[in-house]
Amino acid sequence: RDPEMSRGLGDVYKRQVCFLSHNWKNDTEDICIVPEEIVSEATGGTYRRAITAELNRNVLSGEFDRIVSIGQVVPHEVVGMANYTKNLLVGVGGRDMINQSHMISAICGIEKIMGRENTPVRRIFDYVQKNFLDQLKITFMLTVTCEKHQDSDLYGFYIGEERETFSAACRLAEKKNITWLPKRAKKIVTWLDPAEFGSTWVGNKAVYRTRMAIADGGELLILAPGIKSFGENEEVDSCIRKYGYSGTETIQNAYENGEFNGIEMAAAHLIHGSSDGRFKITYAADPKLMPEEIMRSVGYEWTDIGPMMKKYQPKGKETGWYEDNGEEYYFIKAPAVGLWRVKGEA
């Protein structure tokens, strides 16, 4: 049994239920091709390439009376608002859609996508839904939740088969999961639960969700006691170690030279995870899990998690403005479930 699954699902995992772990490299079948002209239209002409959509063959087997897709609607760096058809086309989808959707978001610009319902990638997903997914019996169960007092509060629960189910959830998520600050913060401190975040691939949600609220020349300090790798698999991890978070121009040039063929999602991640020199990104990590020289080798700053835990005391701390010895900072206890922006900025 998978200890991570057991920890996440609790008693549900102990029941006589079959849990299938999706292998996006080997478990999929092609369902349709999104034509080049549709992709170009969806991206405003910035991306011209046909995309193959795939699904896990178990979803396509016809053995089930009903397919239920459950997930949380929350701001997302690739599709704008997470879940709905993303749960299928990426969650149990294949390499091409995963790679191309990530690259589209990087090229179009993360600031124009985060927290928005109608985005280039969502329009591509809508095409696949209209031309294939609507043939399947899929019920979407979508939640809108917020972190509150060390727990998650459920604010909305939407059930249906139509696009409007997702749109309704998005309208609530825009109100509950986007925080508007009165000004840009010179310093933002975020907390990553070690039980959830073991890689920068996942941990960099702290970068994506806060970047629009950090002042030029400011700093993002990520308290990450569980960080021990960069990628979630060896292929992506080695790619991150090779190129580092070296900035949009460097990564995009490498991409255009064909250096990321078949692993475009890594290129997109490296673009999303760079501040392009606008602000400093520092990971506070356990030196036994992530040594200083390794973290610095990919372009991030590093500091020891021990002293930072004593200084900022993140456990039990609520999101908000704080001051430490004359230094003002904004603390975020759960960056992965929100988006922080500044009032008056587009």
What are the roles of these predicted feature ranges?
Residues D2-Y13:
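Single conserved hydrophobic/aromatic residue that forms the stacking wall/gate
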Residues R15-W180, M212:
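Conserved, well-structured core segments that form the ligand-binding/active-site neighborhood
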Residues E29-E36, V78-N83, D151-G156, W201-V202, ...:
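Short acidic, glycine/serine/threonine-rich loops at helix termini
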Residues V68-I70, K187-W191, L221, Y330-F331:
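Structural motif
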Residues Q72-P75, P194-A195, P287, P335-V337:
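Short glycine-rich anion-binding loops that position phosphate/pyrophosphate groups of nucleotides
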Residues T145-E161, R184-V202, R209:
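Glycine-rich phosphate/diphosphate-binding loops and the adjacent beta-loop-alpha structural elements
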Residues F197-L289:
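C-terminal catalytic subdomain
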Residues D276-A346:
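Extended hydrophobic packing segments that form well-structured cores
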